[in-house]
């Protein structure tokens, strides 16, 4: 088998990228990761197929629903799977998750074990997958963003502020993400109440609608937010960089993250990063952010607003972090992973052909007929 994956080779590798977000629910980080992966591979001259039933050199799974499962069961090519979530990610995201978490964990473990290799997006996910005791290799491949896309352009700041009715001279703290308990909506609003002279903007909505944990409570909380809060709702991804350009710092009070793509997006925009002090962030972002909690967020944001030297220092640190997670580096890393997985899968199948996929495919298809 020719395992060359260099973009200047005559033969282009074919990657079948699987994501149920293409014609499904958007407005969340997994869809963003899919877009960034797709675009990075295309820039690297890879032949990217989306949700294809045609043969490919390798299949790269981004989501873990039933459609992705069917693709995996019918695959003849090697499979790599991006692990964006662990069981803990479900609590505070989806309704009654604590009740059905054991079933979700069982399915997640089954799903991940169908891959030839699992690509964990952060050390936190590596640890979570370790607790699940998977039987397949796990490798750390962090998320990435196209840094150029998020660098502010002339006019963006003024245009967005005018559209949103924000004072041109106001200090703006922005959060980008879903509205759900896990994301720290309560801390965001309480901090806004304590800082009436700062404008707080939340970009993102509830893409899963009534499946969102505490959906009605979230709706009431947003409706009762103070006047210095702006909730933009679901926003086309191409417009998100403009909202970062209109802000002065990122305020990301999420209580649980496996990575935090919004952090890298904001860093690429040159914003100081005010984050909750989570164990997820330190191995990824080092000392490039200001850590806080519910009691200290207002004080941290005030220091960014009032201390120009501090603000400038953390702007530089943010840009340095963004460069580390540029999507062009992701493409290079993925190409190397594909090569290794393809070589290993070929060797393993010559030694012991895997027959489980046809059997599971038959069982799954038969189950669907019985429904």
Question: Language-model segments: which ranges?
Answer:
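Aromatic "clamp/platform" in nucleotide-sugar-dependent glycosyltransferases that forms part
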Residues: 255
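Conserved donor-binding/catalytic core segment of Leloir-type glycosyltransferases
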Residues: 167-183, 189-195, 201
């Amino acid at each position: 088998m020719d395992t060359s994956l260099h973009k200047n080779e005559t033969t282009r590798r074919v990657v079948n990228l699987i994501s149920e977000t293409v014609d499904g629910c958007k407005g969340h980080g997994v869809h963003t990761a899919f877009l960034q992966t797709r675009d990075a591979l295309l820039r690297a001259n890879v032949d990217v197929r989306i949700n294809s039933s045609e043969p490919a050199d390798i299949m790269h799974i981004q989501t873990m629903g039933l459609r992705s499962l069917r693709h995996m069961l019918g695959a003849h090519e090697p499979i790599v799977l991006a692990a964006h979530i662990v069981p803990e990610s479900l609590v505070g995201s989806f309704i009654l998750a604590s009740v059905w978490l054991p079933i979700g964990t069982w399915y997640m473990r089954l799903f991940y074990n169908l891959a030839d290799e699992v690509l964990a997006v952060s050390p936190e996910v590596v640890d979570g997958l370790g607790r699940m005791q998977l039987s397949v290799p796990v490798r750390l491949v962090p998320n990435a963003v196209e840094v150029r896309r998020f660098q502010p352009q002339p006019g963006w700041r003024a245009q967005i502020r005018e559209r949103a009715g924000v004072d041109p001279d106001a200090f703006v703290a922005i959060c980008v993400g879903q509205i759900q308990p896990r994301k720290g909506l309560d801390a965001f609003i309480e901090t806004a109440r304590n800082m009436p002279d700062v404008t707080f903007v939340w970009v993102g909505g509830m893409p899963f609608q009534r499946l969102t944990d505490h959906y009605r409570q979230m709706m009431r909380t947003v409706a009762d937010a103070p006047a210095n809060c702006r909730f933009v709702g679901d926003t086309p991804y191409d417009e998100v960089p403009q909202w970062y350009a209109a802000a002065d710092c990122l305020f990301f009070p999420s209580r649980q993250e496996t990575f935090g793509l919004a952090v890298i997006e904001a860093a690429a925009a040159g914003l100081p990063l005010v984050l909750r002090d989570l164990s997820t962030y330190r191995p990824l972002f080092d000392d490039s952010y200001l850590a806080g909690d519910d009691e200290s967020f207002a004080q941290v944001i005030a220091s960014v607003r009032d201390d120009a030297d501090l603000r400038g220092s953390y702007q530089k640190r943010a840009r340095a972090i963004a460069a580390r997670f540029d999507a062009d580096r992701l493409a290079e890393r993925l190409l190397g992973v594909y090569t290794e997985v393809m070589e290993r899968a070929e060797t393993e199948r010559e030694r012991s052909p895997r027959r489980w996929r046809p059997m599971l495919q038959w069982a799954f298809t038969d189950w669907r007929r019985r429904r």
